[in-house]
């Protein structure tokens, strides 16, 4: 009995001498060096990194597509346009080098410069106008019917001598009416615009981008950028074209919507709904 106890004790001692660092209370082995002392200390409040949750988004200046240019054919031939009825673009920077040199050569021969070359600068304060920037009158409530009346009135006016505040308001009118169109109709609106102005397909991308960005404009940022970056004549050409085509261009393309609304036409009118009577008298003078 004594002999067996001694044998058991000696086997335990040999086992302990083989594994001197094993901790019998832990079944998992340590992944780091057991001799390494954990010297980490809790961080103070000043050392704790707090994530910055409120980053201010950097807003760069909006990139506006170039204005569609319908250059005066007289100007492209090297002659100054003296017609008061020409509504084409007369900006010299629209000409290529050959056309510009030809114009300069003819200009030095004594041709008098036309007044159509002079464009007045815009009031840049109106990029983001306030109510005080416009003359306040007894205007009617702004309903859809009133919007259409305003558009019909200004579509027939010559905007070349219009004051800046009214031109800025007309740009807003174009943006508001563009958003009344279905998004699927913006392509048709662009094509109608090109045909009305006699512009080539090389201008289609710029015109379509303007309509798309006006349609999705939030807070009027793109509208303000248009006012700042387009020259006065380009704005007048775009606004005039839009007001002339907007009231004749279909605003919906869904066959369900179109066929459903077609059933609401008055019985005596087989083509289009009858025109509403114009109860509001608009001033026909352009200041």
Curated annotation (Swiss-Prot):
Segments of this protein annotated with the region RNA-binding: 26-40
Gene3D superfamilies, per the entry: 1.20.120.1160
GO terms for biological process, alphabetical: symbiont-mediated suppression of host innate immune response
Name of the protein in question: Transcriptional activator VP30
Ranges where the record places region Disordered: 1-52, 268-287
Keyword field contains Phosphoprotein: yes
Physiological role: Multifunctional protein that acts as a viral transcriptional activator. Promotes read-through of an RNA hairpin in the NP open reading frame to enhance viral transcription. Mechanistically, nonphosphorylated VP30 hexamers form a ternary complex with the viral leader RNA. Clamps the RNA template and the complex VP35-polymerase L together, thereby increasing the polymerase affinity for the RNA template to increase transcription initiation despite the presence of RNA secondary structures. Also assists stop-start transcription at gene junctions to promote transcription of downstream genes.
Subunit structure: Homohexamer; hexamerization is essential for RNA binding. Interacts with the nucleoprotein/NP; this interaction plays both essential and inhibitory roles in viral RNA synthesis. Interacts with VP35. Interacts with host STAU1. Interacts (via C-terminus) with host RBBP6 isoform 1. Interacts with host DICER1; this interaction prevents TARBP2/TRBP binding to DICER1 and thus allows the virus to counteract host RNA silencing.
Segments for region (Interaction with the nucleoprotein): 180-197
A Pfam family assignment: Transcript_VP30
Source organism of this protein record: Reston ebolavirus (strain Philippines-96) (REBOV)
Compartments it resides in: Virion; Host cytoplasm
UniProt xrefs under InterPro entries: VP30_FiloV (IPR014459)
Highest taxon of the lineage: Viruses
UniProt-annotated stretches for the region Oligomerization: 94-112
Listed GO CC annotations: host cell cytoplasm; viral nucleocapsid
Similarity field: Belongs to the filoviridae transcriptional activator VP30 family.
Post-translational modification: Phosphorylated by host. Phosphorylation negatively regulates the transcription activation. Phosphorylation and dephosphorylation take place in viral inclusion bodies and are largely influenced by the presence of NP. Dephosphorylated by host PPP2R5C; this dephosphorylation enhances viral transcription and is mediated by NP.
Zinc finger map (C3H1-type): 72-90
Main location: virion
Keywords: Activator, Host cytoplasm, Host-virus interaction, Inhibition of host innate immune response by virus, Metal-binding, Phosphoprotein, RNA-binding, Suppressor of RNA silencing, Transcription, Viral immunoevasion, Viral nucleoprotein, Virion, Zinc, Zinc-finger
Sequence ranges of Polar residues compositional bias: 24-34
One Gene Ontology term of the molecular function aspect: RNA binding
């Amino acid at each position: 009995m004594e002999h067996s106890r001694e044998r058991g004790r000696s086997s335990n001692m040999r086992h302990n001498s083989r594994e001197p660092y094993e901790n019998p209370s832990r079944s998992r082995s340590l992944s780091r060096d057991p001799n390494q002392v954990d010297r980490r200390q809790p961080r103070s409040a000043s050392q704790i990194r707090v994530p910055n949750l409120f980053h201010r988004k950097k807003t760069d200046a909006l990139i506006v597509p170039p204005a569609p240019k319908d250059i005066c054919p007289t100007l492209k031939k090297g002659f100054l346009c003296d017609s008061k009825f020409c509504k084409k673009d007369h900006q010299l920077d629209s000409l290529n080098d050959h056309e510009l040199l030809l114009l300069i050569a003819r200009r030095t021969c004594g041709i008098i410069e036309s007044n159509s070359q002079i464009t007045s600068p815009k009031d840049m304060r109106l990029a983001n106008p306030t109510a005080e920037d416009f003359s306040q009158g007894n205007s009617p409530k702004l309903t859809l019917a009133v919007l259409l009346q305003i558009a019909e009135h200004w579509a027939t006016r010559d905007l070349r001598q219009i004051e800046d505040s009214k031109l800025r308001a007309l740009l807003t009118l174009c943006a508001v009416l563009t958003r009344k169109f279905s998004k699927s109709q913006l392509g048709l609106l662009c094509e109608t615009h090109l045909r009305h102005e006699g512009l080539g397909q090389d201008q289609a991308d710029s015109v379509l981008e303007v309509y798309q960005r006006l349609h999705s404009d939030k807070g009027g940022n793109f509208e303000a950028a248009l006012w700042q970056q387009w020259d006065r004549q380009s704005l007048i050409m775009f606004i005039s074209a839009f007001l002339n085509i907007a009231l004749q261009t279909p605003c919906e393309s869904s066959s369900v919507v179109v066929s459903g609304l077609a059933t609401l036409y008055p019985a005596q009118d087989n083509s289009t709904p009858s025109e509403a009577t114009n109860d509001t008298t608009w001033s026909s003078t352009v200041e």
